[in-house]
């Protein structure tokens, strides 16, 4: 492998054995590609805004003499960039401007004569833009639009599996689901009649739809039945014979022809009989007259002479009717062919229950069902039916729907119209009847070929279309009303409904979610989430077991592991690592093509529909050198089943072993040794890990860490290669390589880093450079680490030395015993940033004022405020401290004579205001790290606001001028090169001031041209700088757009440092979670022979029953990694020769059986080897990919190389007594996470507080400062113990006895510890409720 200079700093040893055929794709592409499709101009008009505009425009007036046409659209530039939007609390969006054309036609002239055309660009609201990381900033907070898994449009055939009817009869149904429009359902009832429902309304006989489509009874029967023809010859009845139709029936008479008896009466007709009849080519047989009785006529029979209808179609024939038919000259009678086996009489029966006879009555029946209570007219009924399924405005199957529809009906072409046709409806009914007759199968609705993904772009487009349709009505009215000569497109379009629809979707849709920003993994997982809930999806209550279950088609598309526990299990899923969506929105996964038994590197993406036809081998199948299968029989998947196939039957092979799982699960080493339930918890808990103060890469990883860290966007990644020219904590400057520069640019890339900002979950986002001055970097290298990343690798937790042993009951039931050393070294110390806001409003009594002059507050409380009444940066504050002083005017109250006197003596004291300052919430303490003041336009800024403004201006100017200097330097170095090449002497040139260089003239014309070009660039650079500075200044000084009635907002940011403490929740990556029970002194912890104490003691009993053995293997491998690190560390301390160091490290990298990773340290310089060794001191990072990890033998080899016992167990000594424990203990290094369930956030106590209004009981929950509920079962417990007084106290004074609790408080204050219980308020509520039922109930005083 070739490593870049940055990648050589630390190389993770990989145990993977399967070759990496396909790199992990960009993990956020599902979001970015979808949104890109939405906003980019699509000339085809298939997707995005373009499609929405084309589907609604042109809008014609009712009279048809004017129309509004759509020409094109463009998106403007956003006013603020992403960071500014987050600070100001506004939406990151761009204005949408649409060019419309108003065409007015001549009224009297022939059609299509244009009278006037006006074109104008119209503003149509703001469209939120996606940031580079796939999120949206809505009102200053980052949100993610989760993709939705919904039922694909098309036709589905299903059955109720015998659950509807008591007899257990299976009822089949078909459902046509459009992308938008009415659903059409066909269903059988227990009597085998076929019914239809529109939009799940009342059911009607299915033939009504056919009649409404203008079919007669005869035509209907003709469509669905084959015919049996009888002929009357010489008063004998003959039947045209098709032998195959007799199969399985019992002969009710002798079947004979030409004097030969083929089947005797009462015998069953078998395949042998049929073969004989066919062989002898028997076309007619004579049947007894009774045989025709009970058959059904296939068409109307009319008496030719009188015109009288003798026998209508679908009537049962009897012997009398036969005689009548014979008399009136009908010698050939057609009947319907039905039997009990595979030609049921369903449609014929349905026609009998159908009350309608012609098209009009059918339309009226449909109208009555859709609009009950309205009087039907012919026009209304016709237009309603037309609009239901045959109007492009109201009904659209979409391209996907049409494709699925045609595939389901086995048609050849997969494209077609978006509306239904007669043939469509009839084909669906025919297929449903075939399924009822036993031909064909019902669909599996949980198959991923029947469920598709709706991503951001598509959902935004739908919302936008909704907005446009609302505008369309208004435009139509305007066109009809107005004076068209003066109208402009702008006067007709109101942007409000459009922007409201879009805003509503991004702001409050169920699928627009507050981004989970605990750490980079939780961000990535949130963006790759797939939800079956949401508008147009399932609901938690309705979803059954089948929908939630893992389906064979999930393989490689949706992760079988990562899904929430609880009510949403299986409804919210995660995209697998390599999965992507195809043009129709179905999930597809990559496979390697197998040609002639050789596995090629050609990659094909297959959707679940296509995959069903192939035989697919697993990724871990053994291959020979040439790429053939090593074994004759290979385990493969085909048609949803897994079995053995011979090697020449295989069509495809999996790309990678981690193809099955999602990003979260692919980060769990030794996943293959964990029980699925625990793996699920492990994957979910990694997302809750809080970024620690110093990130620490996992010693045992899976090799996915780098991909996650880079793709999540929390790190700064080099856009182009070059040399690090400047680096400090807040910016990195790269001088770009010559070959990567655009012609005529300065070739400088500047990366500004994010410092100490707050995430959505109040964790700290901070970037730190990880490159040094003059280092070479390549494109894609990580320049700066973000939260939870270490040298460009995801690092969610810390490597801890763990021992599996009980320790005095402190690790009973999943508790965790932690050494004090962990606290001292700040291993799990985290920084949390809280934002507290103070809003000053305009009230009826006057404006609230932010000031340091607060009534009745001592000097001490104001000590941390400046003269504007706002806390200064760097102040350390605790609960109850004032952060922003604010007073609110209160109404004049009647003054007591004493107050009047005092006010007369001491002058006007501010009694007409009350203190409403922003204080630090109880239980919170920290350091103020930032203050921001937002002032409404037109309100005078206070001193602090002006100071902040000035500081921001200074900073902006400094940033821009530094940027300018860097760019100038780059430019002048190029100018100097041109001048020297043009013949100017270097010494003379250096004596001249730089700005005079451009005045020099060169004789060489080409060089002079270059010089002039550079001079132009220089001018442009300066001009650009002035422009940027002016724009920045305008943004900083302009007033803020605040909510109505708000004058000022002051936001204070507090940073809180939280050390780990008892009650915090910790976990490993294998679902092994626990709560810290005790922080133990270092000297009491168990230690080994070298005197090294362990950091954490875990309970060994937590492993066997939970079957997550991965944690033990991780512990052993971690120990080996650390052992090798220790040896390297010792060699570095002894200052061994580089050659020896290189040899040892090379040995470690080469270890293992046929691993795919080849690291050749001979290509590294001595410096690079030393730097690599320096980074391996604390342990050699290892990767064991999912399902392709380290084997037991390899772990033992590695342990031997690190001079450690191969059992992975060592002798420990008790820290308190110094005695040896009686048996060796498993000790090693495990990667532990601190989860965002901190005891500080949960700890809560209440004395008195707020009460519920009706019941007068204390509220519940920490947010309401509520009490602990003493519930029904707790009352039973006290009753069982007969603790009457305790119980009385609980049910009265501690709960809802209003007088009692006030008295009790008073008594406590007076030092009299007595209580007088009274009547609980909830009893009064009960009395009132009984009285409201009209029962008078009173308490009698005894």
Curated annotation (Swiss-Prot):
The EC number(s) this enzyme carries: 2.7.7.6
Database matches in InterPro entries: DNA-dir_RNA_pol_bsu_ext_1_sf, DNA-dir_RNA_pol_bsu_external_1, DNA-dir_RNA_pol_su2, DNA-dir_RNAP_su2_dom, DNA-dir_RNAP_su2_hyb_sf, RNA_pol_bsu_bac, RNA_pol_bsu_CS, RNA_pol_bsu_protrusion
Signal peptide positions on this chain: none
Subunit structure: The RNAP catalytic core consists of 2 alpha, 1 beta, 1 beta' and 1 omega subunit. When a sigma factor is associated with the core the holoenzyme is formed, which can initiate transcription.
Protein name as annotated: DNA-directed RNA polymerase subunit beta
Enzyme class: transferase
Example GO BP: DNA-templated transcription
Domain of life: Bacteria
HAMAP family, sorted: RNApol_bact_RpoB (MF_01321)
Gene Ontology CC annotations of this record: DNA-directed RNA polymerase complex
The entry's keywords: DNA-directed RNA polymerase, Nucleotidyltransferase, Transcription, Transferase
Keyword Transcription: yes
Statement: the UniProt record of this protein carries the keyword Transferase: yes
Primary role: DNA-dependent RNA polymerase catalyzes the transcription of DNA into RNA using the four ribonucleoside triphosphates as substrates.
Annotated GO MF terms: DNA binding; DNA-directed RNA polymerase activity; ribonucleoside binding
Coiled coil: none
Disulfide linkage: none
Gene: rpoB
Catalysed reactions, as listed in the record: RNA(n) + a ribonucleoside 5'-triphosphate = RNA(n+1) + diphosphate
The organism of origin for this protein: Cronobacter sakazakii (strain ATCC BAA-894)
Similarity comment: Belongs to the RNA polymerase beta chain family.
